[in-house]
């Protein structure tokens, strides 16, 4: 009997490892390094996607990316959703002067621009998406009015939350 219980617990532990399962994240959200993430397969313009993330969960925003590890996690998360299109992230140039800012207000120090980016093609690209052609690992500035899938990021709400 003890062997059976041990085996059952081992199977559960192994099935949850690497999935990002976290009791403090909403169902359907994935956890990594203290944050909750979710890919939304809904077409929205950049500003509408940001507003959606803010309304979806307290403290939510389009995803900010601060390390290669986080970028790899997000690429895998998007890949699991079988998305073959570019995906919005929370980086934009609100003043349209090439000064990039994360929508959550966090510091902008890590970059992963694709070759030749940002290029402000046709002087109309002030929002940033993960490029599908790079396996969602590299960034491209894009027209903010384009409708794309997107990734939201939030901190876990903690014990006793309404999540």
UniProtKB/Swiss-Prot annotation:
Disulfide bonds: 25-36, 53-152, 127-144
Binding of Ca(2+), residues: 125, 141
Domain of life of the source: Eukaryota
Domain C-type lectin: 32-153
Subcellular location, record wording: Secreted
Expressing tissues: Expressed by the venom gland.
One MF term in the entry's GO annotations: metal ion binding
Keywords: Calcium, Disulfide bond, Lectin, Metal-binding, Secreted, Signal
Chain location of the short sequence motif Mannose-binding per the record: 117-119
First and last residue of the signal peptide: 1-21
A UniProt-annotated Pfam family: Lectin_C
GO CC field: extracellular region
Listed InterPro entries: C-type_lectin-like, C-type_lectin-like/link_sf, C-type_lectin/snaclec_domain, C-type_lectin_CS, CTDL_fold
Chief location bin: secreted
Record-stated family: Belongs to the true venom lectin family.
UniProt function note: Mannose-binding lectin which recognizes specific carbohydrate structures and agglutinates a variety of animal cells by binding to cell-surface glycoproteins and glycolipids. May be a calcium-dependent lectin.
Protein name as it appears in the record: C-type lectin lectoxin-Lio1
Organism: Erythrolamprus poecilogyrus
């Amino acid at each position: 009997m003890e062997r059976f219980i041990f085996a059952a617990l081992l199977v559960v532990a192994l099935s949850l490892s690497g999935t990002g399962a976290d009791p403090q994240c909403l169902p359907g959200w994935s956890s990594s390094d203290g944050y909750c993430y979710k890919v939304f397969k809904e077409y929205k313009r950049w500003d509408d996607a940001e507003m959606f993330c803010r309304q979806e969960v307290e403290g939510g925003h389009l995803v900010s990316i601060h390390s290669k590890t986080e970028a790899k996690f997000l690429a895998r998360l998007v890949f699991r959703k079988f998305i073959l299109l570019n995906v919005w992230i929370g980086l934009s140039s609100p003043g349209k002067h090439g000064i990039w800012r994360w929508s959550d207000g966090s510091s902008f120090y890590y970059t992963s621009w694709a070759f030749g980016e940002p290029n402000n093609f046709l002087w109309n690209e002030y929002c940033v998406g993960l490029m599908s052609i790079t396996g969602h690992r590299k960034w491209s500035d894009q027209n903010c009015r384009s409708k794309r899938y997107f990734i939201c990021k939030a901190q876990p709400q903690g014990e006793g939350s309404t999540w």
